[in-house]
Amino acid sequence: YKSDGLYADSNGNVCGSPKYYRKSQKKLAKLQRQLSRKEKGSNNRNKARLKVARLQKHTANQRLDFLHKKSTEIANQYDVVCVETLDTKNMSNKGFGNGKATLDNGYGIFLNMLEYKLSDRGKYFIKVDKWYPSSQICSCCGSQKKITLADRIYKCSCGLEIDRDYNAAVNIKNEGLRLLKAA
């Protein structure tokens, strides 16, 4: 999971999130305002309600299409995928200030798609516990140090300076492979 995108992988690739909800927010607000001004029970209100529903469905379809394409790309490319199990619903409710962004990127749906596509292809989908300190462990020397969410660069005493999400991705991959060997 990447807070300002969809994911960061252990190869250094970062997949941004297209933010479909954010892009349609102004138009949605305008349509909802128009809907609120219509008289209840009228044909014009029903038409306005359908316009709002159509835009919401379009936004959801855009997100699903993007997630299907990304999950298919990953499922075709890799034999083993290791992910961190995160509770995105709680992440969006805890007041981190990015609730809409967390829900807009569709990480939970993405993981579900990835899981069934990998299992259909006979590949491995490994879940690493959300309490595993992936961003706090140095991917080079293995030492652990506390960092805050504001720290975007992980700096270790061994001299390693690395993006926090990339460091976490490498650690999640290593832990996932360890879990796979243990199973």
Language-model regions, residue ranges each:
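Positively charged, helix-rich recognition surfaces that bind polyanionic ligands
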Residues: Y1-A183
